[in-house]
Regions:
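A conserved beta-strand element that flanks and buttresses the S-adenosyl-L-methionine
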Residues: 112
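Short catalytic micro-motifs in class I SAM-dependent methyltransferases
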Residues: 115, 119
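Class I (Rossmann-like) S-adenosyl-L-methionine-dependent methyltransferase catalytic domain
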Residues: 1-45, 50-106, 120-135, 140-201
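Conserved acidic residues
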Residues: 109
Length: 201
């Protein structure tokens, strides 16, 4: 992640401007955790975990969760939230775009990106995708939220749907669909977010 984006997120957390924090888990995540075709609990990686609401949701339902974020203030709040919820989550300070291949555990069966990768520059995005691929067990599921590409000032640059197969050549795309469950406002209200679900070969 670029220094500018990191500073931007740090400032927003400091000011309490966190529109990505939600009360309920996103519908596609809830389907994977609790739906009729849910995954058996295992190891989960939540990149850009923020204050930990999705990580805590999964941990309450038996998952062994690691949350990764670049903003220390967000991680401090995430740890407090986990303690208050009575669950154990491993929260790590780090940048998925700078993590070396092999630095993360290689046993994750569920990987969640609730809006991290779509803010990365192309070279960072390729590195992050390779790191996630290395961290996933065969059969693992990656759930990714991404805006459509476009210039929105300081907002995330987005991901072209046509890019996804090239970024994740060792994955099969299970579905992509509009993220109608996400309420966007302000400069990103027309960002046309989509959910992508991929399965590791």
């Amino acid at each position: 992640m670029s220094a500018g984006y990191k500073i931007g997120y740090q400032v927003m957390y400091r000011l309490g401007i966190t529109p990505w924090v939600h009360g309920e888990p996103p519908e596609p995540l809830a389907a994977l955790i609790e739906g009729p075709r849910s995954l058996p609990p295992g190891d989960m990686l939540d990149i850009g975990c923020g204050t930990g609401q999705d990580a805590i949701y999964a941990a309450r339902r038996g998952w062994n969760v690691t949350g990764l974020d670049v903003v220390p203030r967000a991680l401090e709040q995430a740890r407090r939230n986990a303690r208050a919820a009575g669950v154990a989550v491993r929260f790590l300070h780090g940048d998925i775009a700078r993590a070396g291949r092999g630095e993360l555990d290689a046993n994750y069966t569920l990987l969640l990106d609730g809006g991290c990768l779509h803010g990365l520059a192309p070279d960072q995005l390729r590195r992050a995708a390779a790191t996630l691929t290395d961290a996933a067990k065969p059969g693992a599921v990656l759930l990714m939220l991404a805006f459509a590409p476009g210039r929105r000032g300081p907002a995330p640059r987005g991901i072209d749907p046509a890019q996804v197969p090239g970024l994740f050549p060792q994955w099969d795309l299970a579905f992509s669909r509009p993220a109608t469950d996400i309420d966007l406002r302000g400069p990103v209200r027309n960002a046309s977010p989509s959910w992508y679900q991929l399965v590791r070969r």
